[in-house]
């Protein structure tokens, strides 16, 4: 239900603040604009609509506590909480993804980045362009700046990585921003010398682990060796380096991402077990996206939203089993959504906000100076379509980038209130759309969300999480609350 009540009739509606509702099994889920929720039986919901729910009924008290009933004081509190949830709208882009090269030493069956061979050094960012990118990044009004190195394999162009880090640290002595660096790498070109530099500059390191060695190496081919063995070796070595600095291993370690392919679907437990074996306490189960090589190989490695959800829910069920046995492991997407559901805090995950982060939360810089709304927009460009290019350095100013047509168009297309399906959805307070994904899969930035794979997956994930919450198992609810806890990793912010 949307903010109007024309679809419901009942004298109780005039007592209520705007809300949305939808089925949750044989019950009804109600949500309000700041993400508070109540699960009711159909009979209880009918009584709420008719204004016949007794004031001392447990559900009445819950609705009152969660600001569903209208009053001036409640309206003011809701306005303040809404402003807090949406404070990201006024900060400017904080995530700056820098593609220092398209070259890569691995060949992935799903490569979204359209990688190039190691011999092709025409796709490296020059030191001069690296400095121009940094100059542009520091024009953002955001008090926080995260510079994320991607590729290709960013370690292939180590000089550009070093130049960007050193020049950013130098500029920040006067800019005074909360500066953070992140490196997304397959780790196969890591050396002790590079690691020492990254540690000295407090760079977060993230890699890919697609599950057990057999699955990982089938997805990610490394000439002359095992991509999994190399990644595992350096994960352990980097974790040791953090520990040698006296850092808490629960906070400071190599993060890992997983891309699900068809061969992954029948191994949810094995995938989770591999992350536990590697000492990881979080796993990010990511579906394929319609970008890069994944488009060409989809018939071999792809699947339906329903097949992915069967895998995903089996993996989450197993994680909950492990947690009950004392093994700490969480799933990142679930943790992000649970933070939105169970807390007053919004984690500002750029893919799940309204409007999305394209241009106004993140910007992507290609090796050649071309600038894009986001990394996904840059991926579309590598497929031969420049629809999401917002400028080119050094000729485009920061103002030019922010006022470009793609930034404006994606802000409109990702505002959920502007989407006929999303505006009525009970999950609207927790969700977000990706116009670039819509464009790649369905040919338009608004998309046809009824048949949209991404929408089906997020809707299914929220169905699962709310279903578990509604079961009322206190042990599971405790695990879910723990998944929402974010501890400060201040060591990664040493340049402010």
Model-assigned labels for residue ranges:
Residues 103, 107, 111-114, 428-431, ...:
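Cys/His-rich metal-chelating microdomains
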Residues 6-39, 58-97:
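N-terminal [4Fe-4S]-dependent radical SAM core
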